[in-house]
């Protein structure tokens, strides 16, 4: 960190021309109290801004506690600075230092203000996916409801909702005939249940009797139960 204070707007120009190399002197050569000047620069800079450290022209440079200090005057205008660096740095470089220090500060201010200008678009970008997500969710929900309505319908004479795949199986197996019986396999009913399969899914009061003796709602419920637990593979040609 390098801190430079110019006590007058003309001091920079004077620092370039008036404090040329060759006039520099160490503090000890001029009988200056290094500790006192260092403390003033660190804790009481107002006093250094208000008045020069001594009368007349001077060019004082010294290092105290690993920090470089520089105090200069042409007898009318004065400057002072401190920071890490070379104690032998030409006075011309010290005088130009305020311009180098101030320029990054202007850049930092511009960089700091920029995010505030971008804040509004960021909010819009954040909200937009939420709106799209809501629309997609609603659309998906509507499609799901529509699919369920078209694929799960109650059979005629039955209040049980049977999905479209199971309805197709019933049409293929028996043509929807509740009393259909396959003489070769013994499969019976709307869904052509084998007796052992029927007994595993039918209500207790219909177990042990032919599926053809059960009403359509009971046959539908048994078929849905078998389809949901064992899958369509229970019907060989499903």
Curated annotation (Swiss-Prot):
UniProt family annotation: Belongs to the transglycosylase family. SceD subfamily.
Signal keyword on record: yes
Source species of the chain: Staphylococcus saprophyticus subsp. saprophyticus (strain ATCC 15305 / DSM 20229 / NCIMB 8711 / NCTC 7292 / S-41)
Chain positions covered by the region annotation Disordered: 87-161
Principal place of residence: secreted
Biased composition (Low complexity): 102-156
Gene3D superfamilies: 1.10.530.10
Sorted UniProt keywords: Glycosidase, Hydrolase, Secreted, Signal
Gene: sceD1
Pfam families (alphabetical): Transglycosylas (PF06737)
Signal peptide start and end residues: 1-27
Compartments it resides in: Secreted
Identification of the protein by name: Probable transglycosylase SceD 1
Protein EC: 3.2.-.-
A GO CC term assigned to this protein in UniProt: extracellular region
UniProt feature, compositional bias: Polar residues: 87-97
């Amino acid at each position: 960190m390098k801190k430079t204070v110019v006590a007058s707007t003309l001091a920079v120009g004077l620092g370039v021309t008036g404090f040329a190399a060759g006039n520099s002197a160490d503090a000890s050569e001029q009988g200056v109290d290094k500790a006192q000047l260092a403390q003033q620069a660190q804790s009481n800079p107002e006093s250094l801004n208000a008045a020069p450290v001594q009368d007349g022209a001077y060019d004082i440079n010294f290092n105290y506690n690993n920090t470089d200090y520089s105090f200069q005057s042409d007898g009318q205008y004065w400057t002072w600075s401190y920071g890490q660096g070379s104690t032998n740095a030409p006075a011309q470089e010290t005088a130009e230092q305020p311009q180098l220090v101030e320029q990054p500060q202007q850049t930092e201010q511009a960089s700091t203000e920029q995010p505030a200008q971008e804040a509004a678009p960021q909010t819009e970008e954040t909200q937009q996916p939420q709106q799209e997500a809501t629309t997609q969710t609603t659309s998906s929900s509507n499609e799901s409801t529509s699919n369920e309505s078209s694929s799960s319908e109650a059979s005629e004479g039955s209040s049980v909702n049977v999905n479209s795949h199971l309805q197709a199986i019933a049409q293929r197996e028996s043509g929807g005939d509740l009393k259909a019986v396959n003489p070769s396999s013994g499969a019976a009913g709307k869904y052509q249940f084998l007796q052992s399969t029927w007994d595993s899914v039918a209500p207790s009061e219909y177990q042990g009797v032919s599926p053809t003796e059960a009403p359509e709602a009971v046959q539908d419920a048994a078929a849905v139960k078998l389809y949901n637990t064992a899958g369509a593979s229970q019907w060989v040609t499903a």
